[in-house]
């Protein structure tokens, strides 16, 4: 049994920051979709879907771009008083 309710799965600032960053990186900004759901423990999982061919651009060389995005979004999530994990998925 989890003590999380539906309202605690919201991270509007983190989602807005994540969406803005990813849309500025990819070629097809309209194909970017961010969904949120329960993650491990008390974390919220933010799943990013990008258009075909854009996943490599978001992940970057050796995953450095993806790791940087995760770091910035986790910092933004502190304004939402939540912990987040970010996963990148090819649509």
Regions found by a protein language model. Give the residues of each.
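RNA-contacting regions in translation and RNA-metabolism proteins
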Residues: 1-55, 67-91
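Glycine-centered tight-turn and secondary-structure capping sites
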Residues: 59-63
């Amino acid at each position: 049994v989890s003590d999380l309710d539906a309202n605690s799965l919201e991270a509007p600032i983190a989602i807005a920051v994540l969406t803005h960053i990813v849309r500025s990186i990819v070629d097809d900004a309209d194909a970017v979709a961010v969904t949120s759901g329960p993650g491990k423990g008390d974390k919220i999982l933010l799943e990013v879907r990008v258009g075909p061919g854009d996943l490599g651009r978001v992940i970057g060389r050796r995953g450095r771009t993806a790791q940087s995005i995760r770091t910035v979004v986790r910092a933004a999530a502190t304004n939402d008083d939540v912990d987040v994990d970010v996963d990148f998925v090819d649509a």
